[in-house]
Structures are given as structure tokens and as C-alpha cells.
A protein has these predicted regions:
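Short, glycine/acidic-enriched loop or turn micro-motifs at the edges of active sites
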Residues: 37-38, 96
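Aromatic/hydrophobic pocket-lining residues that form the small-molecule binding cavity
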Residues: 41, 76, 108, 112, ...
Length: 217
């Protein structure tokens, strides 16, 4: 919306135009990772860093405080703090990943505020984005969750167990054509929900995106 407002303001000047993305690139991609799995720190983040990329890692404080002892091992606050120092975004996925469909609006608010407080207390940053558990949202929830934030995740494409080279290539082609901002949603890498059949598919995709960094922000 801000982009469109600025574009409209400058539209009368033929010598000036507003680039939609940094470097006037054709499209943009954000890679986001849900639920704070331990391998996001040991596998996903290092693979992104190899290519000069950074990701958004949505965490639930309830899971994080269980760490390696959880049924599905999770990142610790120490690991998340180090990732944040390296430039990754650590942000909120609610406190305990409860389905907002079964909660009152006050309970949803409590889940959000408790997790924001935990992230700030343990990492020293205030989350400026938000990811909805189970991707469930209503206009009221979006309005509430958006207060004090630059964005919440309202659209995404699943990157995981159903990913193929063909699907990755089509996604890139569609983003380029539409000049769109794509948001990837990944859960498991080697284990957990929607884990890859072969993680190498993802790394090869990242290599391709790296080779196109003059076109993709």
C-alpha cells in the first residue's frame, strides 16, 4: 500500500519512478520456517547463510522452553539469540500454537502478548511480524495481530514434502511474471511435519535463486 501511494504521488514526474523491490529487481522472496524445530538452527540457517540469505523463524515460546527435551526437538533461546545476531529474523508464532478457531479473541491476544514478551525477554528484540498458528485468521484477528507490526503472514506457499524441482521452477516463473513477493512456508527439513523427501531439493532451489539474485530480492 505504501508503495502504491508513493508511486501515485510521483506518477506525474516522467523522470522519476519507484522501484517495487530493492535494486529494481523483478520479484522478491521471503523464506519462513514454522514452529522452531532444532534443525532450523543446525541445518536450515547454515544453508541460508552459505548463500548470503537470511530467513524468518517463527517460534512458540512454549515449545522453545522445552528445547531438546520436546517430543520434536526445538531450538533453544541461546540458539535463537545467536541466529538473531547473524541477521535472521526471530519472530512470533503465538505462545503455544493453539488454533485460534477454538479461542476467544482475548485468549488469542494473550497468546500473542505472552510470546512477544518471551521473545523480548530472551533475545532482546520486539517481534515486528506475526505468523498465525495453523494459518487460521479472521479480519478481527489480523487487525489485532497487526498492531505494532510491519506485517503478518497472510499468504504463503508450502515448501516441504510435496516440493519438486518443477514446482519450484513454476513458482519462480510465476513470481517473475507477476512481479510478486513470494513467501515460503517450511516446517520440517529431515523430520517433523511436512519434512522434505530429500532436503537437497531445497538447497538446489536456493542455489538457483542465488544465481538469479540480480532479478530476485
Amino acid at each position: 500500500q505504501v508503495y502504491e501511494q508513493i508511486k501515485k504521488t510521483l506518477s506525474d514526474d516522467p523522470h522519476v519512478y519507484v522501484a517495487k523491490y530493492k535494486g529494481d529487481r523483478a520479484c522478491a522472496i521471503s523464506y519462513t520456517f514454522d514452529d522452531g524445530l532444532a534443525e532450523h538452527s543446525t541445518v536450515a540457517a547454515p544453508e541460508l547463510e552459505k548463500r548470503g540469505f537470511r530467513g524468518t523463524f517463527w517460534v512458540c515460546g512454549y515449545y522453545t522452553e522445552q528445547g531438546a527435551s520436546a517430543k520434536v526437538p526445538r531450538m533453544t533461546w541461546d540458539e535463537l539469540r545467536e541466529m538473531s545476531k547473524k541477521g535472521h529474523e526471530v519472530s512470533s508464532h503465538s505462545w503455544a500454537h493453539k488454533n485460534a478457531k477454538r479461542l476467544t479473541i482475548e485468549q488469542v491476544k494473550s497468546e500473542i502478548e505472552k510470546n512477544d514478551s518471551a521473545i523480548y525477554a530472551n533475545i532482546g528484540i520486539v517481534p515486528r511480524t506475526y505468523c498465525y498458528p495453523y494459518n487460521y485468521k479472521t479480519e478481527e484477528i489480523v487487525s489485532m495481530a497487526s498492531k505494532g507490526r510491519v506485517a503478518t503472514r497472510t499468504k504463503q506457499i508450502s515448501i516441504g514434502g510435496k516440493s519438486t524441482p518443477e514446482r519450484f521452477d513454476k513458482w519462480l516463473k510465476d513470481l517473475m511474471k507477476a512481479e510478486d513477493w513470494g513467501v515460503g512456508m517450511t516446517h520440517g527439513i529431515n523430520y517433523g511435519y511436512d519434512a522434505f523427501k530429500s532436503p537437497s531439493l531445497f538447497w538446489e532451489h536456493l542455489d538457483k535463486v542465488k544465481s538469479m539474485e540480480d532479478q530476485i530480492w
